[in-house]
């Protein structure tokens, strides 16, 4: 909502500037009318004032277009999001500060023991590709570890080595068998991944969700807070993921952290569709 309010305020300011410029133009013309032989000065004054007005009008048009874009983006992100999405994540306890620091030990400390999980994890974050799996007994803290990794600045730092000059986008999903249907389904997974990615990269929305983008713009006034969001079908969610996978020339790289696969009740080909990602990596346990 703050984006809409900010843009609306800027438009109001620009409109006040236009009014001021028009009044100034009127005043200048009034002053010059009594002058003899002042026609050239009048024309020059009018040209300068009108140039300022037209520039301001162009700025306002740009702001209006930006407002429409922000409104459409908000509609679509609202349509992807769902109330239960953060529930499982928020229920997982935060790890003690030093509990999992072993995961970020320098590789040199484990050079003689390459089989260690921490060494392999750091290698994967910095240089690897494909899927890195973490397994363990029920109640052993796997979800807490996953939450810790996804949130740790050390993870982002290691991924930057892999991404080189590209930006890093981290997306997460936490399956939950104790939750409702969407919290343990592939629909929840697809919505979470798409929401996380497009919330951080909103400029991708028109490419990834073309039909939804068109529907979101129907009869939409600038700066109108979205009252309803376009609905997505299962087919559209799958198409969006597949479309995202084809965007290989992006200035970003993605890392997905998916927790609780043993609590997943959907079709496993969806997991394969998400994980087989050209030039990207998926992080699951």
Regions found by a protein language model. Give the residues of each.
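Conserved NB-ARC/NACHT P-loop NTPase core of NLR-like innate immune receptors
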Residues: 1-285
């Amino acid at each position: 909502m703050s984006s809409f309010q900010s843009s609306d305020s800027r438009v109001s300011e620009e409109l006040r500037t236009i009014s001021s410029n028009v009044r100034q133009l009127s005043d200048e013309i009034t002053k010059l009318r009594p002058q003899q032989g002042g026609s050239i000065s009048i024309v020059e004054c009018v040209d300068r004032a009108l140039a300022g007005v037209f520039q301001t009008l162009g700025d306002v048009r740009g702001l209006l277009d930006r407002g429409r874009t922000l409104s459409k983006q908000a509609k679509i992100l609202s349509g992807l999001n769902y109330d239960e999405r953060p529930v499982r994540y928020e229920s997982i306890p935060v790890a003690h500060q030093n509990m999992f620091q072993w995961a970020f030990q320098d590789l040199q400390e484990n050079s003689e023991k390459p089989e260690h999980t921490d060494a392999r994890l750091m290698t994967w974050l910095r240089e690897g590709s494909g899927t890195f799996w973490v397994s363990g007994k029920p109640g052993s803290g796997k979800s807490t570890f996953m939450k810790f990794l996804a949130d740790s600045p050390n993870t982002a730092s290691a991924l930057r080595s892999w991404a080189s000059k590209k930006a890093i986008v981290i997306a997460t999903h936490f399956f939950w068998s104790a939750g409702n249907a969407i919290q343990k389904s592939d629909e929840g997974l697809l919505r979470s991944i798409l929401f996380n990615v497009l919330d951080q990269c909103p400029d991708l929305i028109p490419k990834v969700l073309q039909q939804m983008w068109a529907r979101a713009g129907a009869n939409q006034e600038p700066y109108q807070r979205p009252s309803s969001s376009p609905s997505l079908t299962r087919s559209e969610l799958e198409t969006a993921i597949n479309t995202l996978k084809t965007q290989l020339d992006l200035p970003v790289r993605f890392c997905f952290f998916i927790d609780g696969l043993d609590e997943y009740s959907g079709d496993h080909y969806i997991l394969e569709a998400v994980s087989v990602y050209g030039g990207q990596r998926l992080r699951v346990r």
